[in-house]
Each structure stands twice: as structure tokens, then as C-alpha cells.
Amino acid sequence: MEKFRVIGSDKPLVGEVTISGAKNAALPILFASILAEEPVEVANVPHLRDIDTTMELLKRLGAKVSRNGSVHVDPSSINEYCAPYDLVKTMRASIWALGPLVARFGQGQVSLPGGCAIGARPVDLHITGLEQLGATITLEDGYVKAEVDGRLKGAHIVMDKVSVGATITIMCAAALAEGTTTLDNAAREPEIVDTADFLNKLGAKISGAGTDTITIEGVERLGGGKHSVVADRIETGTFLVAAAVSGGKVVCRNTNGHLLEAVLAKLEEAGALVETGEDWISVDMTDRELKAVSIRTAPHPGFPTDMQAQFTLLNMMAKGGGVITETIFENRFMHVPELMRMGAKAEIEGNTVICGDVESLSGAQVMATDLRASASLVIAGCIAKGETIVDRIYHIDRGYDKIENKLAALGANIERVS
């Protein structure tokens, strides 16, 4: 099993990094391509394990899929309607196949998904939304099965709670429904806006994405088109935190400050000099004191849960006392005991972690437990004294495109080993 071997240094991380396209936009966009009847081309797609799995799934459904820079999908030849367990067992995003399949073909089934072990991520909201659009849902032998006679029907849907995944499922399915769908209490993440932009390029009529009310006027068919995936705001934030905790200066290219305003505000509060341009962001921590910040995760435009682990590390290395409260997912502090193995000080109370500042961390053997936690462990290894081995890095490969190469370009001593 592959690992990262990191030799820590007190040398700051300095340089430029090109940010990849957002996994959390690329995945729903690739699944949404099932809705189209003509070829689509998707650019700026990151090279990730989940992307490879999704491309393989689309092929299994009968689509023609290739990658030559951009990802090309011809969904006109789809003739299978089941996403099998052997393909989707490691990837919860596979639930996004269900809405497009039932919307276009009147049927679809998806094995109940896997993915990160960070608490309950129920598919109930996806199922309820599809039922409100007229689909009949059954659960059999570990599969969610959706069927409808004719077309789905537009509806007024009020989501019980804000859910990025369910917002995408309902929006995609409603694109081919008969009539208009109004989705209230919708999630507002940039990746939802990007998915809506993609669908509109194919001929969908979606308005309001990025607000809490999305309106979808159903159309009879979607054609082909080209789209470039939005920048990954979480990868951006991860490298900016790496600059901050190492006392360095990093410029992130191919990204935009409006995607992560809450994160940039907290970096400034932590003492960093933050500058932004049209397609770049820089954080400069040279000769500045790192200060702890208090954070409460929240749906967009609040502070993203996917940046919580990185800021937990920041608080551990900062002066003062910062309190981080996790409101989105349960059981999302599994990185804390691993960081404590490296000498960090922290106390977990329910859904809150309180960090004490330490002068330095020491290298240790640690284990990645989920995607974002693994990133915080790798960054911790970069600034620790001695050698850190990060095990189970398949987690990080699910969400970061060549993170070791990008960190090495900033001066980190990191290599992938077996």
C-alpha cells in the first residue's frame, strides 16, 4: 500500500502552484452528461481516482468515454441503467447517476455508495427529491432503484436541510422533467453553480443556482456542448494554509478569491497577508506571527467543512486559543489524534476541538482517515522535525491531483513510497 514519506523542515514553503479543477464540480458534471443525447467535452478535469471510477462507470453504462486533455463523453449509446457495487463501492458520488438515468431513460439503479468514513451521509434527501418529481423508489439487495412511467413531473420542493448532493440530484433530474421545478432551501456552493452552467450550455433552463431558490424549467432533450470545470477551492485553501503554517509565501494560480471568501477572511484574521487577482490568490506569512482563529463550519457561503482539518492544524501551530466547531458532519475530528501523535495539543468536546499552541511538531507514523484529514497530516509532516510517514494515502488520491509534486515544487521534501 502506498504511503507518503515526508522529511520536515523549518524552511518555509515558497513558490507557485497551479490549482486543478474542482472534484466536487467535475464529478456531478460527468454524471450529468448522462442527460445529454449528443457528445460533451469537459475541460479542466482533475486527475483523480474518483474521476477514473466515474469514467469507467459511464463506459459500463454504454457511453463512449475518452480523455485527451479534456474528457469527452458521448452518452448517445448508453444502454445499461445500473451502477454496480464493484465500481461504486468506494465512491459515494455514484448516487448522482440515479437522477440523470431515471430522468432520461425512465429507470436507473445505483448500489448504495461508499466513500469517506466521516459519519452518516444518508441518501434520503436524494430519494425524497426524486419521489417528489414522480419517481418510484425501491431499495433491494443494497441497490436504490428509481422508475417512472413517461417523464418526471416538475414540483415545488422544499429541502428538509441544506444538502449539496441532493440539490445536484434534484436539479439534474428536473432538467428533463415536464413542467417547472422550484427548489427551496437549496445549497449554494460554487460547484452547484458550475453544474448548472454546464447543463444550461446543453440546453437546460436553470436559474437561481448559487441562491437558496433554484428554478428549473424542464426541457424535452439536452444536446452536446463544451465546459471547463471551476477551480478547486478546497485545494486552493489547502495550499494557502500550507503557506501560513510554514511561514512562507504561496501563489495559487488558476483560481479565484470569490470561491473561498470565508477561508481568506480567516487567513487574514490569522495574520497572513492575503492578495487576490483575477485568476490568482497569494498568502504571505513571511516574518508574521500566526494567530489562532475560531471557526464554525457552515454551508456555503459559510466556512467550508472541507477546510476544517487544515485550520485545526493551523490553530495547533498558532498563538492563542482557537475553537473550531464542526456543524456539518459528525465524527470529523479523526485527524486530531493523529496530529497529537506528532506532538500537537488538542481537546475534543463533542463537535468542538480546542487547540493548544506548540513550538513544533515531531515526525511520526500517522494514518489518513479521510480525504481532507490526510491533507492536514501531509502538511504537518512538511513542517515537523524529522520523518513523517503518512499511511493509507488512497484517501488523498481521491481528492488531490499530484499533491506531492505540487508540494515538492514549493520546497517540501516529500515522496510516494510503497
From Swiss-Prot:
Q: Where does UDP-N-acetyl-alpha-D-glucosamine bind?
A: 92, 121-125, 161-164, 306, 328
List UniProt keywords, sorted A-Z. Answer: Cell cycle, Cell division, Cell shape, Cell wall biogenesis/degradation, Cytoplasm, Peptidoglycan synthesis, Pyruvate, Transferase
Signal peptide region: none
Compartments it resides in: Cytoplasm
Q: In which pathway does it act?
A: Cell wall biogenesis; peptidoglycan biosynthesis
- Kindly list the GO CC terms recorded for this protein: cytoplasm
List of residues binding phosphoenolpyruvate: 23-24
**BP GO annotations:** cell division; cell wall organization; peptidoglycan biosynthetic process; regulation of cell shape; UDP-N-acetylgalactosamine biosynthetic process
InterPro entries tied to this protein? Enolpyruvate_Tfrase_dom (IPR001986), Enolpyruvate_Tfrase_sf (IPR036968), MurA_subfamily (IPR050068), RNA3'P_cycl/enolpyr_Trfase_a/b (IPR013792), UDP_GlcNAc_COvinyl_MurA (IPR005750)
Q: Is Glycoprotein included in the keywords of this UniProt record?
A: no
Which HAMAP family does the protein's record reference?
A: MurA
The record's comment on protein family reads: Belongs to the EPSP synthase family. MurA subfamily.
Role according to the record: Cell wall formation. Adds enolpyruvyl to UDP-N-acetylglucosamine.
- Which NCBIfam families does the UniProt entry name for this protein? murA (TIGR01072), PRK09369.1 (NF006873)
**What name does this protein carry?**
UDP-N-acetylglucosamine 1-carboxyvinyltransferase
- Taxonomic path: Bacteria, Pseudomonadati, Pseudomonadota, Gammaproteobacteria, Vibrionales
Q: Which gene name does the record give?
A: murA
